[in-house]
């Protein structure tokens, strides 16, 4: 990886001299590199997903009729706003927040579909640079937008940044000890929590959405600094005892007679080998698709319709709280891998579908009387989604050979994007149907 700092002091090659070894220096160097990479991947996960999360948290503001031109003087309505659609029992925008979801996810889907075919031919450093530039551009474009269409173009830039970054950094984990996957996953969960919480907090404090978005321009700069200045060279990594212990318990996902090789050879895999690896990955891809379909159908199809009038929170504030609590659950579970390892992720998919059915029934029948019960369900929803993500990639890292791991990571990261895209496509007509109910 050309962009990572990785100079190392060589040991003396002098012969004939017996010197007293200093075994603690290499150990300290190894520990220092371990923590630099751990922090580096955590920050990369945080920065990569930050713009994506902020755009979803701002979805109601992007589409709201209560915004003024330029997003410069947004004022939250009172606790009982006049419905946008007076003939509906819901307080609906003319366009579902799923429209923002689709703009925030479809470019990512295209990138992830094409990534296994040839993205590995492009060096990592240019990919990271493009990702950072797109993230910064998304904040600026949405902040200064005077129309929903222009704002959605900014959301598309955030999607390109997040999608390109995710497939790049997950592939990059193949060159480092498997422990960095846990740090990356925790960072992406942190992006959800900090992104939603920062947008909620700054707008609650009185900043306009424009000022809030412009205040976040330091995040893309932090992403570039984490990659180019913090990560050590992967060639210097030594997996160590933890890796050996994990490999002894590994159950191969792909049966092969070929000996394992060092990661980095995915570009030499034949189409037949890629297809064989892909078929083995379906056991993990399908449940992750289902989990993300269910949770984002809730987030972008139902959040806007779960509106309680018997509370001091306005509709926009309720939507931001939903997003923040969901992301808090995601962060907690994505950071829990060392405490709880789940092999059978199908169970998480089933539980998430039950969440969807329950909240959809509440939207239809309106039997929940307190917003705080919905808060608990949404927090639980986030816990399930985060656990599915981190355990899926951890299981794949354990059960694929080194020569297949880079390709497997790049391929599996399409799972969440595919599920989110399907949920957005179905949430749009559902929104229109429910908002026409009197």
From Swiss-Prot:
Subunit and interaction comment: Interacts with DCTN1, KIF3A, RAB7A and RILP. Interacts with CLN5.
Which is one Pfam family of this protein?
Answer: CLN3
Q: What does this protein do?
A: Mediates microtubule-dependent, anterograde transport connecting the Golgi network, endosomes, autophagosomes, lysosomes and plasma membrane, and participates in several cellular processes such as regulation of lysosomal pH, lysosome protein degradation, receptor-mediated endocytosis, autophagy, transport of proteins and lipids from the TGN, apoptosis and synaptic transmission.
TM ranges are 38-58, 128-148, 152-172, 183-203, 278-298, 347-367
Annotated localization: Lysosome membrane; Late endosome; Lysosome
Q: State a single Gene Ontology molecular function.
A: sulfatide binding
GO BP, one annotated term: regulation of cytoskeleton organization
Glycosylation site residues: 71, 85, 310
Stretches assigned to the Cytoplasmic side = 1-37, 149-151, 204-277, 368-438
Annotated positions of the Cysteine methyl ester modification? 435
Q: Where is the lipid attached (S-farnesyl cysteine)?
A: 435
What's this protein's name?
A: Battenin
Similarity-based family: Belongs to the battenin family.
Q: What Gene3D superfamilies does the record tag this protein with?
A: MFS general substrate transporter like domains
**Which residues lie within the region annotated Disordered?**
1-25, 237-268
**Xref: InterPro entries:** Battenin_disease_Cln3, Battenin_disease_Cln3_subgr, MFS_trans_sf
């Amino acid at each position: 990886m050309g962009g990572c700092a990785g100079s190392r002091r060589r040991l003396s090659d002098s012969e004939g001299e017996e010197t007293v070894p200093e075994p603690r220096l290499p150990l300290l160097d190894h520990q220092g590199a371990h923590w630099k990479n751990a922090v580096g991947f955590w920050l990369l996960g945080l920065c990569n997903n930050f713009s994506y999360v902020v755009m979803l948290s701002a979805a109601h503001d992007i589409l709201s009729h209560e915004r003024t031109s330029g997003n410069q003087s947004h004022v939250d309505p009172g606790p009982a706003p006049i419905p946008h659609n007076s003939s509906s029992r819901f307080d609906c925008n003319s366009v579902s927040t799923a429209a923002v979801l689709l703009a925030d996810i479809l470019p990512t889907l295209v990138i992830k579909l094409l990534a296994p075919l040839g993205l590995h031919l492009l060096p990592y450093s240019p990919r990271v640079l493009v990702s950072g530039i797109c993230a910064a551009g998304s904040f600026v474009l949405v902040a200064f937008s005077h129309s929903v269409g222009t704002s959605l173009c900014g959301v598309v830039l955030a999607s390109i940044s997040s999608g390109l970054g995710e497939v790049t950094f997950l592939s990059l984990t193949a060159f480092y000890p498997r422990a960095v996957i846990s740090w990356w996953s925790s960072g992406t969960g942190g992006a959800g929590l900090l992104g939603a919480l920062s947008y909620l907090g700054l707008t609650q404090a009185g900043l306009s959405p424009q000022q809030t978005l412009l205040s976040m321009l330091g995040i893309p700069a932090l992403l570039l600094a984490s990659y180019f200045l913090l990560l050590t060279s992967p060639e210097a990594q030594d997996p160590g005892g933890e890796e050996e212990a994990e490999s002894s318990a590994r159950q191969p996902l792909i049966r092969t007679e070929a000996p394992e090789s060092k990661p980095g050879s995915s570009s030499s895999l034949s189409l037949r080998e890629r297809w064989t690896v892909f078929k083995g990955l379906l056991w993990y891809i399908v449940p992750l698709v289902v989990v993300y379909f269910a949770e984002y159908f809730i987030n972008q199809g139902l959040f806007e319709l779960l509106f309680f009038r018997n509370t001091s929170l306005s509709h926009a504030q309720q939507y931001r709280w939903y997003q923040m609590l969901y992301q808090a659950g995601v962060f907690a579970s994505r950071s829990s891998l060392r405490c709880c390892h789940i092999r059978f992720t199908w169970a998480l998919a089933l539980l998430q579908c039950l969440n969807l059915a329950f909240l959809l029934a509440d939207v239809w029948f309106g039997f929940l009387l307190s917003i705080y019960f919905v808060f608990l369900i949404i927090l639980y929803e986030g816990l399930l989604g985060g656990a599915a993500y981190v355990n899926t990639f951890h299981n794949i890292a354990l059960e694929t050979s080194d020569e297949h791991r880079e390709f497997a990571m790049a391929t599996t990261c399409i799972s969440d994007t595919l599920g989110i895209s399907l949920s957005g496509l179905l949430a749009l007509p559902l929104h229109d149907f429910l908002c026409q109910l009197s």
